Amino acid sequence: GGLAAGISVYLKQLKPEIKIIAVESEESACFKAAKDAGEPTSLSSVGIFADGVAVKLMGSETFRLCNQYVDEIMTVTNDEICGAIKDIFDDTRVIAEPAGAMSVAAIRKYVKQNDIQGKKLGGILCGSNTNFHTLRYVSERCELGEQKEAVFAVKIPERQGAFKQFCECLGGRTITEFNYRYASENEAHIFVGIKLRGGRAEFSEITRDLNGKGYECFDLSDNELAKLHVR
């Protein structure tokens, strides 16, 4: 919260009408917790993806300043952060660290939620403390965060040609990932990623189509455990 405190104090002295929005990761929202409690309060746990902001307890002076000068708090998910990292790279060929990209993630979210047009929005983009191994995680998560991919667990018959038949039921959609798990002589469990063309509305359409053709399937696109450990 030190950056938010310092920036908000400075900007409010220059132009008091500026709206200051603090951004936190949903997994380490210590300012939001302090705001709700009226004083700094320790979180039981924090996520480490955005490790630059993985703080359990907000400092008392930082809280005092942010509480006085910050107008609003927004939280962003890991998927939204990954989408922001991708956008920054696409536009500038610069790779921001997760904590540094949170402001861009929040701007994207704020514009969408409030249908913002013709306004000037600014974000503080800082930090390049990332590593090569993080990039694969970011690449996979941003597709889910931007709703360009859906992930399903599906039961299919354990027989020759069953996967081909399953693919034909997808209506020409591209399969981005496939993991197979033998279950029994009659049944197999598969974990499948499917590229989307129509965003969120397509999730329920795929589920409905597969269920209608006799497949038992579960949408895991928003399942954090699946995103972290099954892929």
Indicate where each model-derived feature is located.
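Glycine-rich phosphate/pyrophosphate-binding loop at beta-loop-alpha junctions
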Residues: 1-68, 109-156
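A conserved regulatory-domain signal marking ACT and ACT-like small-molecule sensing domains
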Residues: 132-231
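Beta-strand->loop->alpha-helix junctions that form or flank phosphate-binding loops
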Residues: 23-26, 75-77, 96-97, 176-184, ...
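Short, well-ordered alpha-helical microsegments
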Residues: 4-5, 103-104, 203
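A short, charged, Gly/Pro-tolerant segment at domain boundaries
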Residues: 101, 105, 123-129, 226-228
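Active-site-adjacent helical/loop segments in soluble small-molecule enzymes
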Residues: 59-118
